[in-house]
Regions:
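Terminal RNA-binding accessory module
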Residues: 374-466
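Short flexible coil/turn linkers enriched for glycine and charged/polar residues
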Residues: 172-175, 185-187, 284, 294, ...
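Conserved, mostly hydrophobic/aromatic
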Residues: 189, 209, 226, 262, ...
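Generic beta-strand/beta-sheet core signal
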Residues: 35, 194, 227-229, 263-265, ...
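Short, solvent-exposed loop/turn segments at secondary-structure boundaries
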Residues: 81-83, 200-207, 235-241, 302-305, ...
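Radical SAM enzyme [4Fe-4S]-AdoMet core and its adjacent flexible, acidic
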Residues: 39, 235-252, 256, 303-306, ...
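Conserved SAM/AdoMet-binding glycine-rich loop
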Residues: 103-106, 113-115, 218-341, 352
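Proteins enriched for Cys/Gly/acidic motifs involved in redox and nucleic-acid/cofactor modification
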Residues: 1-227, 232-234, 273, 288, ...
């Protein structure tokens, strides 16, 4: 992994060049529209691009029609995500006819697919700039080229080990944010496209992560979410390896930081050291997202998850013994190729035994480019729908039961924003439970004690306790 400070200087210089160019080109501040699709790591990169463009002198608008630059950060986990982007481009074509000066920028995971690039080049020639995940750090330079060029620029790298630090970012919240600690994935689950578009795992140096978080805390951040496709394998690729548990301890030592969250954790790599660290920590939130995907050992093997039903259940028991009040959430796929009723019953059995606080349930979606897409024995749609409905009913029942344990208790809430209903504010407990309560604007970004009065399943209505 190459933490390239020289490249950082180069890109910051291109930001300055773009700023001067924008001043020359526009009489008043130009506008940009940006839209994110996909995971929280994508969201962080969208924040970075928004921060860069704002630093160049652009102001953000909420409609493509009002923008001088339209930017899409794309996701390709499901093929439907690709279709949505093509739909957006059809809409943008008519906008660009009315405003030929409009710049259209596409980046992210979808752009790493050769067939996508070919299609954009042939059918969407009005798109101005296209780049991928491996040269994301080159955005200021590429955008400068685009501002000086009439034609289409496509610059997609197959791989890169560079991590560029110190770029501007535009955070949604001033008091909490995500921090990427690593990039890429080495797991190659048979249904997942991510390793092919994000590349192999590369970890940031712990010193760079700590420096970034200290800067965020100095800027008012009190809660961070440490992000990676599999945070449990953090540090293995570094010249001087560091475990994720060791990194957590370093982050915990940062004065002024109150809460630490992280995701995603692959069950095969969740160590006893990490469980101990969670149990002993005063800042790591007692919420763990532990994707199960299936409760069937047979299906898990075909998925290439590298654990089985028994190991997953043992892991959950170990976690609950160490952290009894843990809030446990998961991901579950229904209808994976070859899934039988017995396999599905194994999944229901795990849900029964694990008492998840909530679960993200998905119907299997065939993703071209993955081994699973070529598998035979695709499960009929009506069977999948029936299983999905049965699973969802159980997940909701167990979730309501798990959440109800907090009813009548007083919890510390980080207040995030005012809801659509005036005077009602929302925040989260350390268990990642959403709470609505009457309050005022001054509470946003603060930690307050709230009595959880009424459980509504996966969220609560409460009242200030002080």
């Amino acid at each position: 992994m190459n933490n390239n400070t020289q490249e950082s200087k180069i890109q910051l210089e291109y930001i300055n060049k773009c700023t001067e160019l924008v001043k020359e080109k526009y009489e008043k501040a130009p506008a940009f529209f940006i839209q994110n699709a996909g995971c929280q790591m994508n969201s962080l990169q969208t924040d970075t691009v928004a921060g860069i463009v704002k630093s160049m002198g652009y102001t953000e608008v909420s409609r493509e029609e009002d923008a001088d630059v339209v930017i899409y950060n794309t996701c390709t986990v499901r093929e439907n995500a690709n279709l949505k982007i093509y739909g957006h481009l059809g809409h943008l074509k008519s906008i660009k006819k009315k405003n030929p000066e409009l710049k259209i920028v596409l980046f992210g995971c979808m752009m790493q697919e050769p067939e996508v690039i070919e299609k954009i080049h042939k059918e969407y020639s009005f798109v101005d700039l296209v780049f991928g995940t491996h040269n994301f750090h080159k955005f200021p330079e590429l955008f400068y080229r685009s501002l000086n060029t009439e034609g289409q620029i496509i610059d997609v790298w197959k791989e890169s080990d560079e991590i560029v630090e110190g770029m501007p970012s535009d955070r949604k919240y001033s008091f909490k944010t995500g921090v990427n600690i690593m990039f890429g994935c080495n797991n190659f689950c048979s249904y997942c496209i991510v390793p092919y578009v994000r590349g192999r795992e590369k970890s940031r140096e712990p010193e760079a992560i700590i420096e970034e978080i200290k800067g965020l805390v100095a800027d008012g951040v009190t809660e961070v979410m440490l992000l990676g496709q599999n945070v449990n394998s953090y540090g293995k690729t570094l010249e001087h390896p560091v475990t994720f548990a060791q990194l957590l301890k370093q982050v915990e030592a940062i004065e002024g930081l109150k809460r630490i969250r992280f995701m995603t954790s692959h069950p095969k790599d969740l160590s006893d050291e990490l469980i101990r660290t969670m149990a002993e920590s005063k800042k790591v939130c007692h919420h763990l997202h532990l994707p199960m995907q299936s409760g069937s050992s047979r299906i898990l093997k075909i998925m290439n998850r590298r654990y089985d039903k028994e190991k997953y259940l043992e892991l959950v028991d170990k976690i609950r013994n160490a952290v009894p009040d843990i809030s446990l959430t998961t991901d579950i796929i229904v209808g994976f190729p070859g899934e039988t009723e017995k396999d599905f019953q194994d999944t229901l059995d795990v849900v029964e035994k694990c008492d998840f606080d909530s679960a993200f349930t998905f119907i299997y979606s065939k993703r071209s480019g993955t081994p699973a897409a070529k598998m035979e024995n695709q499960v009929p749609e009506d069977v999948v729908k029936d299983r999905f409905d049965r699973l969802l009913a159980l997940v909701q029942e167990k979730g309501r039961k798990a959440s109800s344990r907090f009813e009548g208790t007083v919890q510390e809430i980080l207040v995030e924003e005012e809801s659509r209903e005036k005077g009602i504010f929302t925040g989260r407990t350390e268990y990642n439970l959403l709470v609505h309560f009457p309050g005022c604007q001054d509470l946003i970004g603060k930690y307050v004690k709230v009595k959880l009065d009424t459980c509504k399943g996966f969220y609560y209505f409460g009242s200030l306790a002080e």
